[in-house]
From Swiss-Prot:
It comes from Haemophilus influenzae (strain PittEE). One of its GO terms (molecular function) is tRNA binding. The gene is pheS. Keywords: Aminoacyl-tRNA synthetase, ATP-binding, Cytoplasm, Ligase, Magnesium, Metal-binding, Nucleotide-binding, Protein biosynthesis. HAMAP family: Phe_tRNA_synth_alpha1. This is Phenylalanine--tRNA ligase alpha subunit.
Amino acid sequence: MQHLNELIEKAKLAIESIQDRSLTALDEIRVEYFGKKGHFTQLMQELRNVSAEERPAMGAKINEAKQAALEFLNAKKTEWEQAELNAKLEKERVDVSLPGRKVETGGLHPVTMTINRVTKFFSELGFSVENGPEIESDYYNFDALNIPKHHPARADHDTFWFNPELLLRTQTSGVQIRTMEKMQPPIRIMAPGRVYRNDYDQTHTPMFHQIELLYVDKKANFTELKGLLHDFLRAFFEEDLQVRFRPSYFPFTEPSAEVDVMGKNGKWLEVLGCGMVHPNVLRNVGIDPNEYSGFAVGMGVERLTMLRYNVTDLRSFFENDLRFLKQFK
């Protein structure tokens, strides 16, 4: 029994002598005394040399001594772990009285803001949004829109072609054709989306956004078109603008016009194109042009955004410069 007490004291002394409360050193002592080859384990193995009558009592004493030493070790381990945690927390302590970090909120891209502004205006007038594929067929992008085979828009330097029949759409007009094929008049839709043209400079990018309008009914006329666009432009720019319609040419409308607004510098600025849907386009989708008429409008979203916010370089919208984008929050 005296030998067991000495072993307990020896274990306690070894634990107390550990420098800097090292948990690694403490674990080494655990292995030395309680491991497979530890002191207490060896004592248990020596019981085989003790007589059967003395073995139970001797085994109980060894277990009691082992438990006392182990409890001392575990108590130290818990104490040191808590001290280590407290030191770590103290080191990482947060001063809750300090002002918090400013969290910046995101905002809509100016192009998205314009799309939302335009679609909101026309949706309140009964126009619904229709979408179509960006990889379009030659038929829907050109043929059905009365664009002749020799038209320059079909050339490789203006259009991104995949093969002789498939291309990246140059306009969202294909959505108008697809809608007229599946719907009967009256039709009142808008088609926002990305379009692609092989051009890149201060006022052109290879990809840009367009919104087209289509209205088909028995009484659609140019006077109604003019009134609609007057109201839209004044609402969009929030000014009582001067608006003028200039005769123009588009293969898919007849008559056709380009629409200008008077800028602050006293000069006319082109904002969109429009016209009455060409009878051939109506025939291509099975609508009788003798019974129905319609008008169409096409506007470049980036163009409208540049004019509304006085942006001079179209490419700024696609450079993701936060210094530029923050101005539109």
